[in-house]
Amino acid sequence: MSAPHADEPRHAPPYRPQALEPRWQSAWRDARLFDADPQPGRPKWFIVELPPFATGQLHMGHARNYVLADADARFRRMQGYNVLYTTGFDTFGLPTELAAREAGCAPERLARECSEAMAAQFVRLGLGHDSRRITQYHVPAYYRWVQWVFLRLFEAGHCFRRDAPVAWCPQCEVTLAASLVDDGRCWRCKRVVSTVVQPQWFVRESTFADEMLDGLDRLAGWPDEVKKIHRDWIGRREGLRLRLPVRGRAHGLALHLDDAGWLPGVRFVAVGRRHPLAAAALRDGVQPGETILLADVAQAAGAAGAVELPIIVEDAPGDAARAGRPDAVGADRALAERHALAAPSPGAGGAPAVCDLDAMLAAGQAERVVGYRLQDWNIARNRYWGPPVPIVHCAACGPVAVPEHALPVRLPEDVDLSRPGNPLEHHARFRDVRCPRCGASARRDAQTLEAYSSPWWYHWMCKRVDVDDPFNRDDANAWLPVDLMIGGADQVRTCFFHVRMIARALRGMGIADVDEPVTTLLALGMVKQDDRKMSKSAGNAVSLASIIERYGADALRLAIIGAAAPENDVNWSDDLVRRQRAFVARLWAFVHRVAETEAGIAAAHDAGDPPAAGRPDALQRRMQDWLATGGRRIAADFRRHDYHLALKNLAFLFERLQAFDAAMRRRAPPRAEDVAILAGATRQLVLFLGPFAPHVAEELWQALGGAGLVAGAAWPGADVVRSSAATAKREAFA
């Protein structure tokens, strides 16, 4: 048998993450370390991660979100904060419904099984969620409150119903949200989508446009790029509001001009595919294709008489109308040339027939106003798997809210998903009801609320675990606002926008007190495989389970954290994990060797050879400086959410400890004071490691004779949040 390498401990146990990681996960669970309840006098830290769609196994694209959130939670807990960190599972929505159709099972069963499997993977990844607060969004106790908030919006006039074009997939036979249409094709089956007109439910987000715009200046913890996108999305514009009559129609045409100087050159009006005039054309069986020149003509006042403006349905989403000029570059010129709309020619045969601002103001066709690009939020879909819209349609009373005592309106389970279309429309027991107002025969609304319909879900996380009401003010105010929200940058125009809007609506309706619910936002870049976004539908997802089985959860966590800055994309490669596994192996061997050396010095001391005491020499002082500087840098990086830099500083500190160890051993035999300094520094290094690689940190802490759990320990040194409650609860690092 060969002798051990000089850099290896003689009696170090083998590093077997598959065996040790579940053991420490059980220890954390048994100690209830991650249960969070309000503690007066102790600073709080509330972390919210965007929940995964529960349609299968977790992959690397999911893991980045949750590993970074967990690392932040562990750091803040060690800093003395009372940390609330939990999760949920987005078990409603079209992906789950279609997957259930393909599997031939009920969506409820698929959602439950997938979320349970994901929860087990969260544990295996070492995530420290408060398990008491985890929920599945398809549970009636949860979606009762989704319906309750919808009704409050409806009663306050923030929610309304109107006809609108929607994307339709003929293969999947469902309506699609804009986020599920990729380059004109269904995200799942890749079939070209068409457009149909249906009654739709909308939320008036524009009501809150100015408030949301003004509030952006207070969001110091939000990325500048996200705030810029929100400003552009709201699109506040000071210009003209035009109300033009349309020949032969009772209702006119409303549009906005950013600049009154644009008006004289206007020769046509272009409308999006969801505009009511476009909807009328679609209802007559005309598909938009590229563009359509309607028979309808808008009329505007001019200095020399009325000006007729042709109306074109352009190949653009939304329901906006805009004024077009043939002499403009780009889309306007192309539309004008395609439909032979000439530019005005002033001077030929007298005054040209052009729009005139003074004449239009006098005729009541123009008004100086502030307008917005922001459109109403389509919040419901004509499909089965979602919270039913809690409205009853009565011939006499119109749309009537379901009484609060009758909530939740439950989804029927005995539906036939093999039948085309929305099964709720054909389910007589669900559909046919009495009007809550007059008692006449009526029909339930057959639409269901979309996946983003509860952008207040953080209220559910911070309620007491023994109550049902997520809008108890005392519970909410104990934790809100959210200190850190983490999610993909692809949610900038959806979740991250709706979360700000709904907070203002809740405050305005007297339900909640905060208007900016998120103090700091971390918008993550994508995880890619071969330069394509990693996803199950793209067929390039890397299995989380297989990586953990091969390398261990800690190596995977380190690879995710160290791959790039959170806001940057990551092109995934297994080499990232292999390198971190090698790093863990070096650290494992080093710590066990330090433990052996310290034990040897202690044994010699017990045998009557006491170590000599003295002032630290230059080498020892340098080690102490490295340790203090490294700890400060790691903590500062964490506070800035530069987790990748924190890991680099941890690795750099490890190199300094190795350098000290090598210098110490050159002064053979090792001096007791050198060993004491090295052992103390190594203990601190292991504590610093805790947020990154919590399982191996616990194992190494135990090898060094540390008391308690790293997950419950204080951050080394003075760099800790101080409070009477925190100090009383935690051991000081000596």
Regions found by a protein language model. Name each.
Residues 2-88, 144-145, 199-286, 292-293, ...:
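Structured secondary-structure scaffolds
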Residues 140-158, 171:
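Hydrophobic or amphipathic alpha-helical targeting/insertion segments
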Residues 117-130:
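A glycine-rich helix N-cap at a beta->alpha junction
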Residues 131, 510-521, 595-616, 664-670, ...:
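Short, glycine/acidic-rich hinge or "gate" loops at secondary-structure transitions
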Residues 84, 342-347:
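Short hydrophobic alpha-helical runs that function as membrane-insertion/retention elements
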Residues 177, 194-195, 330, 402, ...:
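Short functional micro-motifs and their immediate structural scaffolds
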Residues 574, 578, 641-644, 648, ...:
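C-terminal low-complexity, glycine/proline- and small-hydrophobic-enriched intrinsically disordered tails
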Residues 8, 38-46, 77-115, 131-134, ...:
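NTP-dependent nucleotidyl-transfer catalytic core
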